[in-house]
Amino acid sequence: MKTNNRDLPLDQFIEFALYDKVNGYYMKKNPFGKEGDFITAPNITRVFSEIIAIWVVTFWKSLGSPKKFNLLEFGAGNGEMIKVIIETLKNFPECFMNCNFQIHEKSDLLKEKQQLNLKSEKITWIEDIKKIEQNLNFAISKEQEIIEYSPGSFEYLKNICNLIKKNDGGILIIDYGYLDIKMHETLQAIKNHKYSNILENIGETDITYNINFDLFKKFTNQFDELSSIISNHKKFLTSMGIVQRAEIISENLTFSEKSDLFYRIRRLIDEKQMGELFKVMLIKKKKNKFKTGFEID
């Protein structure tokens, strides 16, 4: 890509197309849901976010139920996931009362929507993750919040890894990607739930890419005190009991409501849909042997 007769690196082009203050895709429209260009896992069914919340509680307990900790979500979209997480954690009062909920959001438009959707909750929006309070830290990154390969993405990951080294905790990364050592060309644009030309309608289409999780794993290996585990959507969510949770919920549903719920669950775990394509990665300290959600080989 060239601008003003000079080459523009791909990561800078994506940053401009998505986050330019005036023309960026995420700066001027809501991309989520039927009226947007794509649907994310938390918007398919709230059960997904409930499962993530239960995982957070389990991880928190494995670390000795610390009295203060930060739960940070990178790019909260319309705020639906962290909203459900907060609602679920209220069933675990000790965990809820000791948690500082935080969001790191680049888009001013989405930040406004999040603040409206979450106005009754105790949430802090942060600009610089280096300025997070010096407490135990949990971070959640989902769907396209870390670039496929760019200096910026690894700078984010480096900052989080340093926080984990210093304060303990971990980061849960959920995204579509692959584990091959060989790099894949996966860049694509999406508009109205359909593929589009990446160089057309810049600022009007979402740009997506599959994460190379092998690169993330190698990057993590540079930190002697840290380790990582990788699974996929199907194995992680199944191990965490998403089907059993859906069965409990469905007991009080009509036949059509029950059918719709299990259709949505299948969408998350079916290998031909999100079950295999989406990966789940946990980065934590080596001394922490926690593997909940990652037991299935």
Task: Map each language-model feature to its residues.
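Rossmann-like AdoMet
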Residues: 1-74, 78-130, 241-244, 249, ...
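Long, Lys/Arg- and hydrophobic-enriched amphipathic alpha-helices
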Residues: 135-297
